[in-house]
Amino acid sequence: MATQAKGLLSEECRDALNQVASYELHVSDAYLSMACYYIEDSEAPIFHSFFQDQADVKREHAKQFIKYLRKYKCKICLPVIKRPDIDNWGTGKQAILSALQLENSLNTLLQDLKASASRNRETNLLRFMKKFLDEQTRNISYLEYQLNYQKELETSAQREEQPENAAGPSGASGQETESAGNSPSPPAQKIPKPAT
């Protein structure tokens, strides 16, 4: 607590805060790249708006961490993180999987920062971080849900393709089976907004 009385943060916490701010910007850039990739995808227009929103949220988080560092008169020294060299994010499932990996890495950094704050008795930092940790948990759960949803869509699409391929010219009477017409179609792609 002596460090807080002087208005300073421990070096360990300063370094961890800089790392988290830098990684938030990195995630924001990756999400912006994903948003740009899906901007003209007529089959998955919601991916564009989702990733654009997340890019804005992550950039705002980075600003909040930097503001916290400035509040305690700490040096801002953001480590450089190489931007992903991905121009083709692929299917929605692949993009969500990439997003989930980014969020899990960010969660690890936040947990490390929390551990540093606890070791150094930085109670103000622990209070400040709570909302980010809670939101991170929600984001990861949301992306896991979306990943499972995308897998279900793929499975459903594969099932619908199989009867067409396997049936061929079936039935001597020339009548089509009703089961294909009555099977439920997969729900439309929908990505609801995560809590921010």
Model-derived segments and spans:
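Iron-associated oxidoreductase/ferritin-like identity signal
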Residues: 1-196
